[in-house]
């Protein structure tokens, strides 16, 4: 299951804010870290400052937590 940059993936990590959401792979780190795949999403999460629009729209995942779409 070689995931590469630009692939569309579905998140399968149940505790993630983006569980079952589809995002686009922004980068894949090959240095051996635990969560090497950076996925970018269209919507943002709840991590914004009070009164400010926005939040995070990227998150790191392990390859086994992602499913190619």
UniProtKB/Swiss-Prot annotation:
HAMAP family on file: PSI_PsaE (MF_00613)
This protein's GO CC annotations: photosystem I reaction center; plasma membrane-derived thylakoid membrane
Chief location category: membrane
A biological process from GO: photosynthesis
Family matches, as InterPro entries: Elect_transpt_acc-like_dom_sf, PSI_PsaE
Superkingdom to which the source organism belongs: Bacteria
Biological function: Stabilizes the interaction between PsaC and the PSI core, assists the docking of the ferredoxin to PSI and interacts with ferredoxin-NADP oxidoreductase.
Disulfide bonds: none
Signal peptide segment: none
Family statement drawn from the similarity comment of this UniProt entry: Belongs to the PsaE family.
Keywords of this entry: Membrane, Photosynthesis, Photosystem I, Thylakoid
Lipid bilayer topology: Peripheral membrane protein
Subcellular location: Cellular thylakoid membrane
Name of protein: Photosystem I reaction center subunit IV
Lineage: Bacteria, Bacillati, Cyanobacteriota, Cyanophyceae, Synechococcales
